[in-house]
Amino acid sequence: MMQDVSSSPVSPADDSLSNSEEEPDRQQPQSGKRGGRKRRSSRRSAGGGAGPGGAAGGGVGGGDEPGSPAQGKRGKKSAGCGGGGGSAGGGGGSSSGGGSPQSYEELQTQRVMANVRGRQRTQSLNEAFAALRKIIPTLPSDKLSKIQTLKLAARYIDFLYQVLQSDELDSKMASCSYVAHERLSYAFSVWRMEGAWSMSASH
């Protein structure tokens, strides 16, 4: 019986069944391989998409690198502009340096003119006081300052007003200016020595 079974030929139906069972097993590894290939291809495509972007980024970064030719040209241009600014600054310094001596000269001229005007005023004031001292009767011992001279002139005017109000001078003495001036000077000196001057000066 065993020999009959083993020697019995395999039927075509059984062969087809066995083949059909083996085919799914073969297809599964192939499908796994295809899936792996698809995944790899998708990863490659993603990597390739990132690749151009990276290349583009690298291109942009390369443009910003200091060693690139474009950056070198820009650096040269900026250096040229900086040099021009320096020269312009130097020109401004030279112009300002040229303007400072002129202003100093103007200040010196103004100071000289102010000093000249001050001396002229002092000289004219001294001349006016000298003329006033000639008119006002003074004593030989008088050493009057300018303020004292002005006070004495005011007192002398007051004295003259009092004399004109009185009837002491007659027509003859009034007709002679020299005699009148001498009498007035003498009277004014007496008036000063009597103490009227000191009393009036104290007010």
UniProtKB/Swiss-Prot annotation:
Keyword field: Activator, Biological rhythms, Developmental protein, Differentiation, DNA-binding, Myogenesis, Nucleus, Repressor, Transcription, Transcription regulation
Domain called bHLH: residue spans: 109-160
Keyword Nucleus among UniProt keywords: yes
TM stretches of this protein: none
Record's protein name: Twist-related protein 1
UniProt-listed InterPro entries: bHLH_dom (IPR011598), E-box_TF_Regulators (IPR050283), HLH_DNA-bd_sf (IPR036638), TWIST1_bHLH (IPR047093)
Localization annotation: Nucleus
One of the Pfam families matching this protein, by short name: HLH
Region (Disordered): 1-105
UniProt main location, coarse: nucleus
GO biological process, one term: cell differentiation
Domain of life: Eukaryota
Ranges of biased composition (kind: Low complexity): 1-18
Subunit and partners: Efficient DNA binding requires dimerization with another bHLH protein. Homodimer or heterodimer with E proteins such as TCF3. ID1 binds preferentially to TCF3 but does not interact efficiently with TWIST1 so ID1 levels control the amount of TCF3 available to dimerize with TWIST and thus determine the type of dimer formed.
GO cellular component: nucleus
Compositionally skewed regions (Basic residues) per UniProt: 34-43
Segments of this protein annotated with the region Sufficient for transactivation activity: 162-192
GO MF, one example: RNA polymerase II transcription regulatory region sequence-specific DNA binding
Biased composition (Gly residues): 46-65, 80-100
Keyword presence, Cytoplasm: no
Function in brief: Acts as a transcriptional regulator. Inhibits myogenesis by sequestrating E proteins, inhibiting trans-activation by MEF2, and inhibiting DNA-binding by MYOD1 through physical interaction. This interaction probably involves the basic domains of both proteins. Also represses expression of pro-inflammatory cytokines such as TNFA and IL1B. Regulates cranial suture patterning and fusion. Activates transcription as a heterodimer with E proteins. Regulates gene expression differentially, depending on dimer composition.
PROSITE patterns, per database record: BHLH (PS50888)
Name of the gene encoding the protein in the UniProt record: TWIST1
